[in-house]
Amino acid sequence: ISWEARTPNGVLCSQVGEGIDNVATELGLSTGNDWGVNRFGLLRKVNMIITNVQNSSTLNETEKIELKAHGNLMRGMIFFDQARKMGRFVPVKEVFTVENPEAVNIPMTEDVSESYKLIIEDLQIAANDLPIENASGLPTRWAAGVLLSRAALQAYAYTGDASYLDVAITAADDVISNSGVELSNSNGLFNETDLYNPEILWGYYREKENTYVSSFEELMRTYPNVSTDNVINSQSPVALKQANGQTFEGWAIYFPTQDLVDQFLVTDEETGKAMPWYETSQYKNNVTVLDPSSITEAGQVDAYKQVNGDARRIPTPQDLNQLNKSYPTFTRYHQLNKGADRDLSELMYSGRDRRFYTAIVYDKCSWIGETVELNLGGNLSAGVRDKEDGGWYNTTTGYYWRKSNIENPTPRAYHNCQVALHFNIVRLGEAYMTIA
């Protein structure tokens, strides 16, 4: 989830102990950052697998082929990770020894083309030689095939070599046609309610007995921290039930952005076509479009005071301090028409691409048994605690992450709660997206 915060899809923001993220800009990067350069320890382990398997006198040929394929898969994935972050990397493909120190003088790949050539070579071996079935948590030929198609598609994007498109399509089609797996409508693919769905071709699994919410940032750093007193002071129209104690007691600093939310299209109720929420007929018929450049004062859109007298405003003074003509803070300014029978949240979020509902926590949805309010003054909103712009372990964007979260942490979302957690490394749906 930290890498998602390096994209327009997410942010990392804390206005308390962790501070504001300054690594999301080029000015925040330095030679002191490790963005995947130092993978030599991992590569040594992988290369030892490949070398020792090939030199084994106890393994039969079938065992050698399969075990070596595991090594090729892991090396291909490491190289792919490095290529995506840096383009070029040091392609370590042998096991170094103290007796031959000169062997470590390996130059970086000449260019991106050489980088992807090495990646594809390793992943093709894995896609050919891994077994078609394996225990949950172990890779198969089908998982390797999807990874191969992913890497080949990326290779085409950065090299322009059209032959990689053939590799991507062939690998994806092989998985779709021959794996015997079908797409699932289950949203439990991304949480604990459907851990072993067949569409998950390869997952990383952690058992409940030794896994806690605090063990992973994807959990501890996505659940907010909001008390009953916060909600009362904020005058939220919807109270938190707090059925098992404080429901949300995480340290959220990662949040999805409006940029990401806008990518999930809405079905137009008149035409049946998928389009951005702000272009649908049902939305346009219920709002008046105003000029966003006319927003010049704090609280101009909406404002009120909490019980303790603290102001809560849209926009906030900080919003107005961050104006940049190249990247406007305010891009849309709409007012709900008088007499409209639906509010803005319903108009924005109803009829979305179904993936939206498994990925994002949004205003008026249900989350861990609570009805979520994310509008001004809401129970999990940006200003519900003492930071008007959010960031005290609560949202700064108006949304929370739901994908790959735990839907029903027992008894509640706090650091010591034990959970059964998994991450999808590869799933069948990606093969279809590659073909598309």
Residue positions per predicted region:
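Structural recognition of the beta-strand scaffold that forms the well-ordered cores
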Residues: I50, V90-P91, I200-Y204, E430-M433
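Conserved, well-structured interaction surfaces
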Residues: T7-M86, I106-K117, E121-L138, N308, ...
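Short coil/turn linking the two alpha-helices of tandem helical-hairpin repeats
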Residues: A83-K85, V90, N134, Q154-G160
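Short, solvent-exposed loop/turn segments at the edges of secondary structure
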Residues: M86, P139, V146, N178, ...
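An aromatic- and glycine-enriched ligand-binding surface/loop that stacks and positions planar moieties
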Residues: I1-G10, R150-A382
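Amphipathic alpha-helical protein-interaction segments enriched in hydrophobic
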Residues: G137-L147, N424-A431
